């Protein structure tokens, strides 16, 4: 609840100025989807950001129209879901005693809130990275192939949402190495 409020209250007026990339993302979405066209999702779009991530940023545009607030709303959604997935990840790693403070700290983290209030693709990483790690760790604990499959899909989404998401596979592999050393099964 705290995460959602911090990311959505006064979304249309805070931050007061538009971040320079927000109108560029809006212009890209307008140009690519004009006339009902659907772009190739696996190419690079504006500023070499993957088209999948840019398109996901405009997920509410068909219903709410192309406005900065609409783009910011999708960022707020990803940031809020990131807090939920961080809770699930910490709970999978430990207990609710670890999960509650982890989710709370992420919910009130200024940088995470800032990214979640901008109409750009950065906040998608705040959701997809902990999702990939949660699903992978769930696979380790439960031994289910389906969890590993979804972890791979979430990792792929990281790589196709924003450039910083390209760091997620090395982080996941490092985490696998740590798990192999400290928690062998």
What is each model feature region?
Residues 1-185:
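Membrane-integral, polyisoprenol-dependent glycosyltransferases
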């Amino acid at each position: 609840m705290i995460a959602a409020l911090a990311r959505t209250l006064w979304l249309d007026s805070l931050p007061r100025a538009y971040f320079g990339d927000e109108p560029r993302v809006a212009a890209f979405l307008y140009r690519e989807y004009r006339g009902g066209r659907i772009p190739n999702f696996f190419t690079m779009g504006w500023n070499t950001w993957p088209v999948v991530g840019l398109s996901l940023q405009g997920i509410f545009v068909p219903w709410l129209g192309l406005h900065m607030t609409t783009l910011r709303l999708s960022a707020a959604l990803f940031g809020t879901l990131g807090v939920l997935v961080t809770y699930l990840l910490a709970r999978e790693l430990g207990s609710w005693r670890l999960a509650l403070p982890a989710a709370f700290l992420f919910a009130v983290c200024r940088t995470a809130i800032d990214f979640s209030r901008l109409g750009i693709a950065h906040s998608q990483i705040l959701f997809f990275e902990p999702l990939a790690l949660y699903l992978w760790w769930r696979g380790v604990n439960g031994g289910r192939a389906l969890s590993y499959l979804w972890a791979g899909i979430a990792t792929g989404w990281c790589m196709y949402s924003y450039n910083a998401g390209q760091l997620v596979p090395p982080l996941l592999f490092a985490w696998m190495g740590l798990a192999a050393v400290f928690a062998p099964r």
